Amino acid sequence: MLYIFDLGNVIVDIDFNRVLGAWSDLTRIPLASLKKSFHMGEAFHQHERGEISDEAFAEALCHEMALPLSYEQFSHGWQAVFVALRPEVIAIMHKLREQGHRVVVLSNTNRLHTTFWPEEYPEIRDAADHIYLSQDLGMRKPEARIYQHVLQAEGFSPSDTVFFDDNADNIEGANQLGITSILVKDKTTIPDYFAKVLC
């Protein structure tokens, strides 16, 4: 079997309120105001596909949100999104590999974040056979082509694949291809799913 794990709020807890909090501290703009103006628009998607640079993304978002931040200040806040690793998921990934399954990570991410989390959480790379990142592939979830790329690269059919993600749109995109897709609602979803399988 091929098991595909998303990264944020699946393997690692993330919280965009921490990003906004850091920017609020730096700019003195109230957090409530930043929450209203923050949305994951086209610049966000372009950045995740690697179509625009980190600097262009920072400039676009600062413009959209009227943030008077330097690139360094923007980056500092952007890295604050990461909270903590989910060790129970890392343990499951290792167990699956020990049983002969293929385990990969598929994440919509960007270069700003990949300068941080691989060093901060080396356990992720150790637990996965391969890591697929949207910025490297030039495509992002829930686009069908990104799932098809992973299936083809790994040599698995949709019927022999299980996908875990915390985003309902991403789950729907994978479901449409016939991939068994599990919406991760909280920290118990993945351990509960494997409770009987990995006894």
From Swiss-Prot:
Annotated GO MF terms: glucose-1-phosphatase activity; magnesium ion binding; manganese ion binding
Entry's cofactor comment: Magnesium. Can also use other divalent metal cations such as manganese, cobalt or zinc.
Annotated active site: 6 (nucleophile)
pH-activity note: Optimum pH is 5.0-7.0.
Lineage top rank: taxon: Bacteria
Binding site for Mg(2+): 6, 166
EC number, UniProt record: 3.1.3.10
InterPro entries: HAD-like_sf, HAD-SF_hydro_IA, HAD_sf, PGP-like_dom2
Function: Catalyzes the dephosphorylation of alpha-D-glucose 1-phosphate (Glc1P) and, to a lesser extent, of other sugar phosphates. Has no activity with the beta form of Glc1P. In addition, YihX has significant phosphatase activity against pyridoxal phosphate (PLP) and low beta-phosphoglucomutase activity.
Organism listed in the record: Escherichia coli (strain K12)
Matching NCBIfam families: HAD-SF-IA-v3, PRK09456.1
Thermal behaviour (record text): Optimum temperature is 40 degrees Celsius.
Keywords from the UniProt entry: Hydrolase, Magnesium, Manganese, Metal-binding
Cross-referenced CDD domains: HAD_sEH-N_like (cd02603)
Protein name stated in the entry: Alpha-D-glucose 1-phosphate phosphatase YihX
Protein residues bound to substrate: 6-8, 107-108, 141, 166
Swiss-Prot/TrEMBL catalytic activity: alpha-D-glucose 1-phosphate + H2O = D-glucose + phosphate
